[in-house]
Curated annotation (Swiss-Prot):
Name of protein: Beta-carotene hydroxylase
Catalytic activity as recorded in UniProt: all-trans-beta-carotene + 4 reduced [2Fe-2S]-[ferredoxin] + 2 O2 + 4 H(+) = all-trans-zeaxanthin + 4 oxidized [2Fe-2S]-[ferredoxin] + 2 H2O
Residues that span the membrane, as ranges: none
A molecular function GO annotation: iron ion binding
Amino acid sequence: MLWIWNALIVFVTVIGMEVIAALAHKYIMHGWGWGWHLSHHEPRKGAFEVNDLYAVVFAALSILLIYLGSTGMWPLQWIGAGMTAYGLLYFMVHDGLVHQRWPFRYIPRKGYLKRLYMAHRMHHAVRGKEGCVSFGFLYAPPLSKLQATLRERHGARAGAARDAQGGEDEPASGK
């Protein structure tokens, strides 16, 4: 029966991490933490960017929780495991799929993965840290809603950014 609780803790943590990551992205990375995150909104030079330090911080916290959980603080290791699972999903979707940091290239053409892909492209369509949309990594609002928000915030510039990306069906290269 304990394994059910452990699995539930991992699952709830993964869901919770999406909320935490979206809030951290919006209010920390696009706020006082912009110094690290700026590198992610510029063309990458080399395999790594300063923004990758956020992954190191979350990984260190996850490792600490797993360690503390293994020393007797039961739920902490499963919270750490959930954070690790979220980190793996984040790496696969955000770094791999969206930003093509894999050795092969795949661009989704339909469904959920296309929605995530395009939502993050719309996030990067805005120059600077202000006025961006879609701060989540594994959930994205409907694309029509994001496009409307961009148009509302940036007027004709949002349409120009979308057109430069080739519209919904043809994402831009780069970030």
